[in-house]
């Protein structure tokens, strides 16, 4: 499954980069976050509560930062497991300065899902994923624009 999106933020690129390059800050915006643990400077683990159709429970995701080019590009991967499901995610994010000195955050992600998720309608998964990402980016936007 491929996902992508753009968000306009009323915050300078340096401020956005400072926020999105800190896993402990990003984790605070994950909907239904249960736990967060930094493993080292390039990897961390989160546990989130998930509920899509009959797939419900806590999912553990191990994130690894693969490539960072401050202040404009980051790429990472995550491997998640829980409730008879496996997910492999690779994602990237690019930050661009806008004409009004704000920042455009453009992201894309590809997810491979196995186990019980294969039994669920793709449109149901897409809908749940869209709600999750909207909540996440609304939180990021709120934190950045209220701290500026």
What kind of region is each of these model predictions?
Residues 1-49, 148:
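Hydrophobic ligand-binding cavity/cleft-lining segments
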Residues 2-6, 43-45, 58-60, 73, ...:
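Intrinsic-disorder/low-complexity, polar/charged segments enriched in Ser/Thr/Lys/Arg/Asp/Glu/Gln
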Residues 5, 34, 60-67, 89-97:
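Hydrophobic/aromatic beta-strand elements that line small-molecule binding cavities or substrate pockets
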Residues 37-79, 135:
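Glycine-rich portal/gate segments that line the openings of hydrophobic small-molecule binding cavities
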Residues 114-148:
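A conserved amphipathic terminal alpha-helix motif
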